[in-house]
């Protein structure tokens, strides 16, 4: 369960190409990538996610404790720039700030680069596969379209931005495909979650 160490390590390294933001308050480490955010308790990082911790030490030169930094890969190494915690806090709130959520489940379908998930009301939401995976089967979605995965045992959380086509920006063909998918129920809501 929880984060796969190798997947999280790969995701962190990949994000440094454009800039990875880390926020550590001593208890949890929050990593902000492009359209995803991962929250890992520090004790889990030290005990279980050794590869991820090794990657962070390689990038920073030390184990993060109470830091807010942006890491960008440059020639021959990494450039680490301090960030204001308030600025990063606003971005974190954009993902985690909404308390009202509703259940959502994977459909097993993909469209373009998104894997598709469905709410109980039939709405289909596309979620990018970029970033680390979290091996849990309990998902929820906020009104703002943030898909949240949580592992209650370890306290690890992954947030991804959901995608829904918009009438003002997406083509009629895309909207038609989406509507066609939404008329069918792709999830067995009566089956217990694994």
Task: Annotate the PLM regions.
Residues 26-28, 32-37, 41-194:
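C-terminal functional regions that serve as terminal interaction/effector modules
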Residues 1-40:
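Intrinsically disordered, low-complexity linker/loop segments enriched in Gly/Pro
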């Amino acid at each position: 369960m929880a984060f796969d160490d190798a997947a999280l390590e790969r995701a962190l390294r990949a994000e440094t190409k454009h800039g990875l933001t880390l926020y550590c308050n001593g208890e949890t480490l929050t990593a902000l990538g492009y359209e995803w955010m991962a929250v890992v308790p520090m004790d889990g990082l030290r005990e279980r996610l050794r590869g991820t911790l090794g990657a962070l030490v390689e990038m920073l030169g030390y184990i993060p404790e109470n830091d807010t930094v942006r890491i960008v890969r440059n020639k021959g190494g990494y450039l680490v720039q301090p960030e204001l915690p308030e600025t990063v806090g606003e971005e974190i709130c954009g993902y985690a700030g909404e308390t009202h959520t509703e259940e959502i489940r994977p459909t097993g379908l993909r469209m373009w680069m998104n894997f598709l998930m469905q709410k109980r009301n039939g709405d289909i939401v596309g979620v990018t596969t970029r970033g680390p995976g979290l091996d849990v089967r309990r998902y929820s979605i906020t009104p703002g379209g943030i898909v949240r995965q949580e592992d209650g045992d370890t306290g690890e959380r992954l947030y991804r931005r959901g995608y829904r086509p918009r009438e003002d920006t997406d083509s009629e063909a895309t909207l038609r495909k989406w509507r066609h998918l939404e008329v069918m129920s792709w999830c067995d809501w009566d089956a217990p979650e694994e």
